[in-house]
Structures are given as C-alpha cells and as structure tokens.
Amino acid sequence: MVSPDLIRNVVGIVGNAISFGLFLSPVLTFWRIIKEKDMKYFKADPYLATLLNCMLWVFYGLPIVHPNSILVVTINGIGLVIEAVYLTIFFLFSNKKNKKMGVVLATEALFMAAVALGVLLGAHTHQRRSLIVGILCVIFGTIMYSSPLTIMSQVVKTKSVEYMPLLLSVVSFLNGLCWTSYALIRFDIFITIPNGLGVLFTLMQLILDKNQDKNLELPTVAPVAKETSIVTPVSKDDDINGSTASHVIINITKEP
C-alpha cells in the first residue's frame, strides 16, 4: 500500500514544477524590457509582493520553524532568486521616480529580520513558531493570490480577456489545486488557506473567461444586393456615350 507521505511528496514535486513555470512566466516581458531598455508601463509591485511572500514561506519551511517541509523551502527559495533577478532588471531600467523600489526592498528586509529574530527568540517550540509565521504567510499569501480580482474587474469593464491570459489562469488553478492537495494529505492549515483561495479566485477567472467567450457577438453580415443584367436592343439611331451600339446592358439591383 502506498503511504500518504509518498503521495504527498509526489504531489509536492508536481507542485514545485508547476510553481517553477509560474515564476518563469514573466520572462518574455523582462526580455522585452532588456531589449528596449525601458520599463514602459510595467510596475514592480507584484514582484515586490511575491518576493516577500517567498521569503516568508522559505522561513516557514525551515526545520527550525516547521520540520518536514523541504518542498516548500525549495520552490520558494527558487522563486526568491527569480523574483530578485526580475527586481534587479526593474531597478536597472527604472527612472528616478521608481528608485523608491529600493526603499521598499529595504523595508521588506528589515521586516523579515524582525520576524526572524522575534520568532526564534520569543517562540521556543515548533508549534508556536509555525503558528506565528504561518499566520503571516496566510495574510501575505492571500493578498498575493487575490491580486487577480483587480484584473477581473478590468475584464468586465472592457469586455476583453486580453488582460487575463487563459493559459496563465489554467496553470495558476492547477498550482493552487496541487498545493491544496499537498496540504490536505498531512493537514497544514497555513498552506491550505492561501492556496485554497487561489483555487477559488482562478476558478472565478476561468468562469469569467468562458462567459466572455459566450457573450462575444458574431458580426452581422449586411445582405448582398443581387444584380440582374438585361440586354436591351438599341436602334441604329440611338447614341450611347457618343457611339452607337446594337444592344445596351442594363443592371437592375434587387434587394434580397
């Protein structure tokens, strides 16, 4: 009989692969920024939020906080590095106004240092440490997962799904579903809540995408007029456009 721990590890590995794909999804955007040396209208806010979220989950998964969570540490550690690369690109190609990103990064670093010191010095059991860090992970994870709601409102206003790529919604749904399953096999409420909400939010996106497809109206085709040609004999004395002809072709347009 297959043990629950083995199933959990397999699900976690699949979740790692899907999450890795999600972390890499903005690569083309950043490649365009590098080529054009311009950030244009792109904002660093989502990447700053994801960076903090990854830092919290890495800390949560450490053996000194929540043992047996190596898969949580690995994928969020990878995500931490990827987000740091994205933010470095933002910093290099940003204007002076966007240099405030450095202040936000410093604030996040100080916040994490305060959390780490407070938890390690103030909480002396795994249960208490997991509780404190887990609550923070739920709060910031929920904020990150709820960000697509603003995109959904934009889709409703514009009646266009170009701002909400279907593939990204599907992969996000599978990612949330995978990590929710992982958390339920050996119940972990702190992983279950944000990922369960992620499943709910991305399912709403998929339903909205489907409804938008149904609401698309097919363009109406205007009825095409039909022409009937009638050949009429002309006498030799008749002059048409300065020349004579034996027959005149008259086009009669008929409405369908």
UniProtKB/Swiss-Prot annotation:
Stored InterPro entries: SWEET (IPR047664), SWEET_rpt (IPR004316)
GO CC terms in record: membrane; plasma membrane
Main location (coarse class): membrane
Ranges of residues in domain MtN3/slv: 10-97, 133-212
Compartment list: Cell membrane
Stretches in topological domain Cytoplasmic: 31-45, 91-100, 152-164, 208-256
UniProt cross-references to PANTHER family, sorted A to Z: RAG1-ACTIVATING PROTEIN 1, SUGAR TRANSPORTER SWEET1
The protein's name in its UniProt record: Putative bidirectional sugar transporter SWEET7e
Protein's organism: Oryza sativa subsp. japonica (Rice)
Biological classification of the source: Eukaryota, Viridiplantae, Streptophyta, Embryophyta, Tracheophyta
